Amino acid sequence: MQIAFNTYIKNDICWLINGISPDVLKEMFDAIHENRNCEVVRSGYYKRILRYTHDRESFYIKRYTVRNGLESVKSIFSLSKARREWNCAHKLLGSQLLTATPVAVGEKRRFGMLKDCYIISKAIPNSTTVKELLIAFRQSSVHALKKNTLLNNLISYVKMVHDHGIFHGELHTENMLTDVDNITLFYLLDLGRTVFKK
């Protein structure tokens, strides 16, 4: 896996990229600011998530905004939320565990203090959250064996993650995806609070 620093800077955001070209990043970032080709997944004051599609490949873009001056000062001495999530995703992938592949992380700082940060990850095709799958199973006449298989796979997966010394911090069924055709494959999402004990 080759990581390359990108010299593309717009609006004082410095980007680290892996897996997309600077041209695609520029196009994506321009689209974000012009609100085109983007679907708003979640929009809060401090966190915004967009889905962007480029050449039939989808990406999720998370933007975190610093809450207050104290958090901005603390950011001089700590990693941004986006950078923590970037690092955790690469550690998970290095441990042969699945997550959304991060392709870019960007930070906007002034005098070393963080203003906002971004992480861009590839969307996981053919997947659904474990929560959505459990709701679908409950509302349909899915055979009990399939339900039990999913639950047993999920329990085994969570045990395996913990056996690797990985503690998610926000482990719940909305932060886990599964492949709709293969319910033995799970992906962890929202890794910002993940701790690696081993």
Segments and roles (model prediction):
Residues E174-K198:
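Catalytic activation segment of kinase domains across protein kinase-like and atypical kinase folds
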